């Protein structure tokens, strides 16, 4: 289970049974670091879970707990989706127009201006004053925000300024992940 894998990783014990898990943890950390260096950013928001009674009425709500094993699965799924998109683009005949890509466009001009206002309010210097805001700028801004409550608030504020991701027959890239090509070869990540 995710919980057992998370505990194994937290204990940092090496054995015949855990060596692969620890190796995968290091590999996915490296993938994430490279993804962020190339322009991906991470907006951490809480995922909420609900308990329901027999009539379907919510009785309790709580934040879904995640651990390192969830992050491993997330990075593996991102990589599988990226590689599947690259494979489709490189190996399928262009006349075969049933390739479906997951696209996430850059923010609209008005929302980019709103993000700039947030950056200016917190005296954040952009890498490029006149160019479009990059996903690297957003990542650096959130990384520089040390107050965790403020970071969550700013993450949600910026997330609301993003265009929604969509599916298309042509790839325009995935702004938030920093990928040129992306698809949903796996199930959407939020389900795990």
Report the location of each language-model feature.
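Conserved, carboxylate-rich catalytic/transport cores that coordinate ions
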Residues: 1-192
């Amino acid at each position: 289970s995710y919980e057992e894998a998370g505990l194994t990783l937290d204990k940092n014990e090496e054995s015949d049974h855990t060596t692969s898990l620890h190796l995968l943890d290091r590999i996915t950390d490296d993938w994430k670091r490279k993804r962020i260096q190339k322009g991906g950013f991470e907006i951490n928001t809480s995922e909420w879970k609900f308990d329901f009674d027999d009539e379907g009425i919510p009785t309790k709500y709580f934040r879904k707990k995640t651990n390192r094993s969830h992050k491993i699965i997330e990075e593996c799924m991102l990589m599988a989706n990226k590689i599947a998109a690259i494979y489709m683009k490189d190996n399928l005949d262009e006349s075969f127009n049933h390739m479906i890509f997951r696209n996430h466009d850059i923010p609209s001009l008005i929302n980019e201006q709103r993000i700039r206002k947030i950056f200016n309010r917190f005296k954040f210097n952009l890498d490029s004053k006149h160019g479009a805001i990059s996903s690297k700028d957003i990542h650096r801004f959130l990384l520089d925000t040390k107050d965790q409550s403020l970071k969550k608030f700013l993450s949600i504020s910026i997330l609301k300024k993003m265009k929604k991701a969509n599916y298309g027959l042509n790839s325009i890239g995935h702004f938030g992940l920093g990928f040129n090509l992306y698809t949903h070869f796996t199930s959407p990540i939020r389900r795990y």
